[in-house]
């Protein structure tokens, strides 16, 4: 009887350990992208391959979050009846102006939400998933379940080329 009780206790602890470990691995917290002089935020409208180069057609936006988002929101929408932004972020895009940016072949690309399996029930936030440029192009074109063109992206541009692309998570 003591062996059975011990076995049940050990099994229970093992199950709790695995659940806690699995939760900890997938429970990375959101961290805002640091604003730098070489980073802009934009919607990506198109990705094309031209003359051996990958080009993004983008529309730059102003991205705000936290207290800064609340401040800009209240300045721009004083009659909203709200005390701040509903979701903690605010996007300003006063004029849509598309322009092209070349992507460096070795650009670092980081995604938060995209279709990995073709099943809507599998779509979930998976923080900071690195993908290759080829994978990113495939993700962008595969818009049946998750249309990533509807997400802002933080683009780091150095020497005229995009060297880093980070998908902005939207709650």
Provide a role label for each language-model segment:
Residues 1-25:
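Sec-dependent N-terminal signal peptides of Gram-positive bacterial secreted proteins and lipoproteins
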């Amino acid at each position: 009887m003591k062996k059975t009780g011990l076995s049940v206790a050990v099994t229970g602890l093992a199950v709790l350990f695995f659940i806690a470990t699995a939760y900890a691995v997938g429970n990375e917290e959101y961290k805002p992208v640091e604003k730098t002089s070489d980073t802009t935020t934009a919607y990506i409208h198109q990705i094309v391959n031209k003359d051996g180069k990958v080009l993004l057609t983008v529309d730059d936006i102003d991205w705000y979050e936290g207290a800064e988002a609340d401040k800009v929101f209240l300045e721009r929408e004083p009659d909203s009846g709200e005390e701040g932004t509903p979701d903690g972020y605010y996007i300003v895009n006063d004029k849509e102006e598309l322009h092209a940016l070349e992507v460096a072949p070795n650009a670092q690309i980081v995604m938060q939400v995209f279709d990995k399996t073709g099943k809507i029930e599998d779509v979930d936030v998976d923080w900071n998933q690195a993908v290759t440029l080829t994978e990113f192009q495939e993700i962008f074109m595969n818009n049946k379940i998750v249309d990533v063109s509807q997400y802002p992206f933080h683009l780091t541009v150095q020497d005229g080329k995009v060297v880093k692309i980070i998908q902005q998570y939207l709650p």
